[in-house]
């Protein structure tokens, strides 16, 4: 029997076992265990349903093929052939859907994120582009019914951002935005360019899953907290008190400074949220590096020094270099219509993973 069918049969058995356990009065009375089993059962429900239907379809295909061999009636033959064609189409679709459902899932996919955008090469133009990217992601988040909150920002005099951090919360945020990690290049004529020459600038985007308290433990002894007087805009109140906070995670050397809020406590809360996300991301990146040594993914490496996309304003063109995707609708993409780009990246990643899954295993057919 095909190895994949063996795995599916195992899932079917486990699903039946879970349903039996969840009907046990002792389990029902043990809330935490019942919730754990319920979550596992819900996670298997879709693939079990599709596999159950696939088995029915395979059985119907066998019956129709036998009927086709035995019948001598021409009208019946045509009816059976038509049924077989429909069944084969459904079979192929179910097999593909099941293969995708069997792909290893990213445990972070359902998490909220902290996104950091930084102006990189290109001076003022890079900071302006960082602001444009921020606006693009905010509009996309709005289209997905996600919530956004700016939690840290360093603005520039020209109206852009040296760096800006945003929390995005909602359903499956990380699963869609994790591919945005990397360097984004813009080619356009700056407003200050009198000769009409196209300039090239870059901004980097970091997407980090929100720390939920169980992913990695931050011990108090590993965190150094320094407080100091805030500088810059904010008024006399800020400058008279030590409201700014700098947190250092000693084992990794990661530093977060926060002075945007009016009170030290507010700055502490936001600094800790960013620090937790960065430390978690640091350890995740180390694990990913080990994983990538055995499997390279064109879209999932998350290397922030890698140029992933070019935005060419004169030609209204956006190109994602990882998958060779070019779309001539930059104006709409910058207005938050990222769906086509993100869907293409997800499909490409799934296709890569399917090839990995099928290496050494037979097809379902």
From Swiss-Prot:
Modified residues (N5-methylglutamine): 236
One GO cellular component, as annotated: cytoplasm
Keyword Cell membrane: no
Protein biosynthesis is among the record's keywords: yes
InterPro entries the UniProt entry points to: PCRF, Pep_chain_release_fac_I, Pep_chain_release_fac_I_sf, Prokaryotic/Mito_RF, RF-1
Keywords of this entry: Cytoplasm, Methylation, Protein biosynthesis
Gene Ontology MF annotations: translation release factor activity, codon specific
A Pfam family annotated for this UniProt entry: RF-1
UniProt xrefs under PROSITE patterns: RF_PROK_I (PS00745)
UniProt-annotated location(s): Cytoplasm
PTM annotation, UniProt: Methylated by PrmC. Methylation increases the termination efficiency of RF1.
Family affiliation: Belongs to the prokaryotic/mitochondrial release factor family.
Known function: Peptide chain release factor 1 directs the termination of translation in response to the peptide chain termination codons UAG and UAA.
Name the UniProt record assigns to this protein: Peptide chain release factor 1
Organism: Latilactobacillus sakei subsp. sakei (strain 23K)
């Amino acid at each position: 029997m095909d190895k994949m069918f063996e795995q599916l049969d195992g899932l079917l058995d486990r699903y039946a076992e879970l349903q039996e356990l969840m009907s046990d009065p002792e389990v029902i009375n043990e809330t935490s265990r019942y919730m754990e089993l319920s979550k596992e059962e819900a996670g298997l429900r879709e693939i079990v349903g599709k596999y159950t239907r696939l088995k029915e379809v395979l059985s119907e295909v066998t019956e129709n093929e036998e009927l086709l061999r035995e019948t001598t009636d021409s009208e019946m033959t045509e009816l059976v052939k038509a049924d077989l064609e429909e069944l084969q189409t459904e079979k192929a679709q179910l097999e593909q859907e099941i293969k995708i459902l069997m792909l290893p899932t990213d445990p972070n996919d359902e998490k909220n994120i902290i996104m950091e955008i930084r102006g990189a090469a290109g001076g003022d133009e890079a900071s302006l582009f960082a602001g444009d990217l921020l606006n693009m992601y905010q509009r996309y988040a709005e289209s997905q019914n996600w919530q956004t909150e700016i939690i840290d920002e360093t603005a520039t005099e020209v109206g852009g951002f040296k760096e800006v951090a945003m929390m995005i919360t909602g359903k499956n945020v990380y699963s869609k935005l994790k591919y945005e990690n990397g360097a984004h290049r813009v080619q356009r004529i700056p407003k200050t360019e009198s000769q009409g020459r196209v300039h090239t600038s870059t901004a980097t985007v970091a997407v980090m899953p929100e720390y939920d308290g169980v992913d990695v433990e931050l011990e108090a002894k590993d965190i150094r907290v320094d407080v100091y007087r805030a500088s810059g805009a904010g008024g006399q109140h800020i400058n008279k008190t030590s409201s700014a906070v700098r947190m250092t995670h000693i084992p990794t050397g990661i530093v977060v400074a926060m002075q945007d809020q009016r009170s030290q406590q507010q700055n502490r809360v936001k600094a800790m949220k960013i620090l937790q996300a960065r430390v978690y991301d640091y350890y995740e990146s180390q694990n990913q590096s080990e994983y990538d040594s055995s499997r390279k993914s064109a879209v999932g490496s998350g290397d922030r020094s890698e140029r992933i996309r070019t935005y060419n304003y004169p030609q209204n063109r956006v190109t994602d270099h990882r998958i060779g995707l070019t779309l001539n609708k930059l104006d709409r993409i910058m207005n938050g219509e990222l769906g086509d780009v993100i869907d293409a990246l997800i499909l490409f990643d799934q296709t890569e993973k399917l090839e990995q899954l099928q290496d050494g295993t037979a097809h379902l057919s």
